[in-house]
């Protein structure tokens, strides 16, 4: 038996299983934290993964619904657990995801109580040679946010992408991505604008790049980002460079973060691709 992928939504998993049945390939679903899709005949793995890639591009394609009707199992009999809102938040994120999220919220509250400047004096990228050995500064800039929209946007993506990485690959991988991308995106942004910047967006862009490329090159990892969302992130990135929104955007951090995530995903999947 070979696990092909996992879906957070059991109905989506059932749609893919039904479609593959019409193609003569039998898959089974095992319900754990997510809906795990398993293949008994491992010789068919290549074909299944190719079909999975097409399915993930457009799960709403009518052919998949038609397959469910053809199989006579649009009502599959699965029981779907209903999660309250906060239980859903907990379910889809691990301890490191939550730790960073709560730190960002705490820092944002302090910024609103004390003002940005006192907080930046303690957390900003080293702005004086005497501060270069205060190691936390190379990462703590990511905890600061300067508007409600800024923090909501970043934390939503952090929870969605960081939670997926931590749940499917492990806390260690998320820690490594976060530390490296915060350091490199901060360094690049410092070269562009000096030390007075902040936000988790460099890390978020790293996660976008990592999750997308890891999912493309290693579908069995269980993480993926729809191509439409990675396209949206690129459009947002380009718009930031041309100041379309009229806001101060850390473009250097965004580009460096995205490049870091792509590079890490490439390295992490290189061995498996060579072996294949």
Swiss-Prot record:
The keyword Cell inner membrane applies. One of its GO terms (biological process) is proteolysis. The keyword Membrane applies. This is Rhomboid protease GlpG. HAMAP family: Rhomboid_GlpG. It comes from Klebsiella pneumoniae (strain 342). GO terms for cellular component: plasma membrane. Its EC number is 3.4.21.105.
């Amino acid at each position: 038996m070979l696990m092909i992928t996992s879906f957070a939504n059991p109905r989506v998993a059932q749609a893919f299983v039904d479609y593959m049945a019409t193609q003569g390939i039998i898959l089974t679903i095992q319900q754990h934290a997510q809906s795990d899709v398993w293949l008994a005949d491992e010789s068919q793995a290549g074909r299944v993964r190719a079909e999975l890639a097409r399915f993930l591009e457009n799960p709403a394609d009518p052919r998949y619904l038609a397959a469910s009707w053809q199989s006579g199992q649009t009502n599959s009999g699965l029981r779907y657990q209903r999660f309250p809102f906060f239980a859903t938040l907990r379910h889809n994120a691990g301890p490191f995801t939550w730790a960073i999220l709560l730190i960002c919220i705490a820092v944002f509250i302090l910024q609103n109580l004390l003002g940005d400047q006192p907080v930046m004096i303690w957390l900003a990228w080293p702005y004086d040679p005497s501060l270069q050995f205060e190691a936390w500064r190379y990462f703590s800039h990511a905890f600061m946010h300067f508007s409600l929209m800024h923090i909501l946007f970043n934390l939503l993506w952090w929870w969605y992408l960081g939670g997926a990485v931590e749940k499917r690959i492990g806390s260690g991988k998320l820690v490594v991505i976060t530390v490296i991308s915060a350091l490199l995106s901060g360094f690049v942004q410092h070269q562009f604008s000096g030390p007075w910047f902040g936000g988790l967006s460099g890390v978020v862009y790293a996660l976008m790049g990592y999750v997308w490329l890891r999912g493309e090159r290693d579908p069995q990892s269980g993480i993926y980002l729809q191509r439409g969302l990675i396209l949206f992130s690129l459009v947002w990135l380009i718009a930031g460079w041309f100041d379309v929104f009229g806001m101060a955007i850390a473009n250097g951090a965004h580009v460096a973060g995205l490049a870091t995530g792509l590079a890490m995903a490439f390295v992490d999947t290189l061995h498996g691709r060579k072996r294949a």
